[in-house]
């Protein structure tokens, strides 16, 4: 951030002002559960072509997606794009902490592990074991040059905040 604008560092180390025109991409196809991750590189490449054609230059994803998404983004940006698509990568915490306490040490450690998984995946250095309701697999595509930013957290419901506050007075 410079003044009131975003800047993005190019691969050669120079900085350009970035006016983000973006698109959100979910984890699944319409009509599927959000935990049924898309695993087609070609489908993502097709989407990236359409996203670029409509004038967008950034993509936001709500959570770590399947490895195929990042492979497709690396391929598209390196091979197809006149201008690369940049990524806002959200790091989604577990939704149901034990006893509803977002400040519990176990919950905090789980979230820190998720942050490590996501950052390692963005650098193409992650092997994430199979897990329920989350993306997993071998992440070998280094898309770190295309990261516009990390979005840490998610919206919390008022009831969740109240429960956490009740368990952590002061």
Predicted regions and their residues:
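Active-site-adjacent substrate/metal-binding segments within catalytic domains
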Residues: 1-78
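Active-site region of glycoside hydrolase catalytic domains
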Residues: 60, 78, 82-170
């Amino acid at each position: 951030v410079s003044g009131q604008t975003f800047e993005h560092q190019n691969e050669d180390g120079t900085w350009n002002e970035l006016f983000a025109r973006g698109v959100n991409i979910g984890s699944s196809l319409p009509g599927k559960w959000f935990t049924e991750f898309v695993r087609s590189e070609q489908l993502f490449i097709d989407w990236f072509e359409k996203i670029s054609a409509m004038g967008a230059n950034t993509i936001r994803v709500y959570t770590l997606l399947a490895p195929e998404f990042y492979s497709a983004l690396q391929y598209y940006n390196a091979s197809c794009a006149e201008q690369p698509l940049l990524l806002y990568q959200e790091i989604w915490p577990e939704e149901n902490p034990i006893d509803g306490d977002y400040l519990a040490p176990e919950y905090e450690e789980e979230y820190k592990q998720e942050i490590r998984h996501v950052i390692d995946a963005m650098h193409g250095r992650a092997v994430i074991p199979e897990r329920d309701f989350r993306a997993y697999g071998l992440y070998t595509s280094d898309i770190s040059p295309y990261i516009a930013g990390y979005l840490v957290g998610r919206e919390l419901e008022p009831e969740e905040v109240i429960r956490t506050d009740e368990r952590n007075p002061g």
